[in-house]
């Protein structure tokens, strides 16, 4: 047997960490909901992680600063803002008296039954990234405990935490919410007006790559344009490689903008209330292709594609996970209603469930009131009854007029914003 250090040139702690990651994926296939194990693609940059802070990438303190060592290289941390400085100070304070803080955490857990934040450094990870055509390596330090609160330059808290209930209907592209103070309907993962332009550029580059790949490898395609089955050899031109570099850079920028937009929306919702009520995540089901073959009124076959592109561009599950983490870590409450709640079908004026078409975005209630479908679902989630875990019809009747007036103003502002301006 050849030692792993001689064969691959890595230490045992790195091999053990990577083996645990692989076994976690195998466990999902054996005992969970996983179907197949996916290998890393050629050219992907691997993350280098050591599961022990004193081995592989050990941490040390010199001149009251954190330093890390990998082989013969010694490097520190570049602190850019006050939040990072607070995190570094918390780690330094733990390393100065680690035994005392560990004993205090254990005693608190035994006596009071909860964990305190020790800010113990757990492990370090080297994350390589390709940014603007150059390789950059970042160090991610995983710390035990909750993140430090953020403050602005004047010393005030950067984020405010509100009180009250929030009902939110998270769709594939939009989120509608109803709170004690306001109602809203906005697109997911959107910062400004640049996301639609970026998505269009991404599509154009992807099509240009496909044309170049087809022109360079005509032997791998059938006469009807489909890819041949079996083992194939692909050749890529220099033009294709340049397009791929542009496409990768654009995808990286779009992913960062999506994550920033998700964090901004989660922080804003947390400022409206401390109880968040929504439906369970179902993006994975909506992303799958339809199994049944159907025909439309013109006799043509309907496409089996569903919401895969919308989910990829808008990340509804990522937004819901970020909101859940935000509310739970800041002292709030996150509630997912049961599957039989059916907020999209209930009509509180008729006290009955009425099924609607997916294309009916605006519809009339039983008493003739015109409502927006997504907002009305969020309103029914807002009227959640803790005892029965169902819709509280009495609260729907008492709160509807106040919330409906806000919804009318919201729809008018949306129509005014989207209407074209007259030409001179």
Model-found features: residue ranges?
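Acidic carboxylate diad motif detector
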Residues: 1-131, 309, 313
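Residues forming well-ordered secondary-structure scaffolds
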Residues: 17, 21, 132-134, 161-162, ...
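Positively charged, helix-rich recognition surfaces that bind polyanionic ligands
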Residues: 137-419
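A short, hydrophobic C-terminal helix/tail in secreted or cell-surface proteins
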Residues: 420-424
């Amino acid at each position: 047997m050849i030692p792993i250090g001689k064969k691959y040139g890595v230490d045992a702690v790195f091999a053990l960490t990577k083996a645990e990651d692989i076994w976690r994926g195998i466990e999902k296939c054996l005992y969970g909901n996983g179907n197949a194990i996916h290998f890393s693609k050629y050219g992907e940059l691997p993350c280098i992680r050591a599961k022990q802070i004193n081995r592989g990438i050990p941490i040390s303190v010199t001149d009251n600063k954190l330093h890390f060592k990998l082989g013969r290289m010694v490097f520190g941390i570049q602190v850019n803002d006050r939040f990072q400085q607070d995190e570094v100070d918390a780690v330094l304070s733990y390393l100065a008296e680690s035994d005392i803080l560990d004993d205090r955490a254990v005693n608190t857990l035994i006596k009071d039954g909860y964990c305190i934040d020790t800010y113990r450094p757990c492990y370090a990870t080297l994350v390589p990234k390709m940014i603007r055509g150059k390789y950059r390596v970042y160090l991610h330090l995983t710390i035990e405990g909750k993140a430090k609160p953020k403050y602005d330059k004047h010393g005030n808290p950067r984020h405010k935490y509100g009180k009250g209930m929030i009902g939110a209907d998270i769709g594939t592209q939009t989120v509608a919410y109803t709170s004690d103070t306001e109602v809203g309907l906005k697109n997911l993962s959107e910062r400004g007006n640049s996301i639609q332009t970026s998505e269009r550029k991404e599509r154009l580059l992807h099509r240009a790559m496909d044309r170049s790949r087809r022109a360079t490898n005509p032997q791998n395609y059938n006469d009807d344009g489909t890819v041949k089955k079996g083992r194939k050899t692909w050749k890529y031109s220099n033009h294709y490689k340049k397009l791929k570099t542009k496409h990768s850079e654009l995808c990286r920028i779009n992913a960062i903008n999506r994550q920033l937009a998700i964090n901004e929306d989660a922080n804003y919702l947390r400022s409206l209330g401390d109880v968040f009520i929504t439906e369970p995540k179902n993006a994975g089901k909506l992303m799958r292709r339809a199994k049944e073959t159907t025909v439309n009124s013109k006799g043509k076959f309907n496409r089996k594609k569903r919401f895969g592109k919308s989910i990829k561009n808008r990340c509804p599950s990522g937004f819901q996970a970020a909101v859940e983490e935000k509310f739970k870590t800041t002292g709030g409450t996150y509630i997912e209603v049961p599957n039989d709640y059916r907020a999209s079908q209930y009509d509180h004026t008729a006290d009955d469930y009425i099924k609607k078409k997916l294309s009916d975005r605006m519809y009339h209630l039983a008493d003739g009131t015109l409502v927006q479908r997504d907002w009305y679902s969020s309103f029914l989630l807002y009227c959640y009854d803790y005892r029965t875990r169902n819709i509280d019809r009495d609260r729907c009747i008492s709160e509807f007029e106040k919330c409906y007036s806000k919804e009318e103003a919201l729809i008018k502002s949306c129509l005014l914003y989207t209407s074209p301006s007259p030409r001179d």
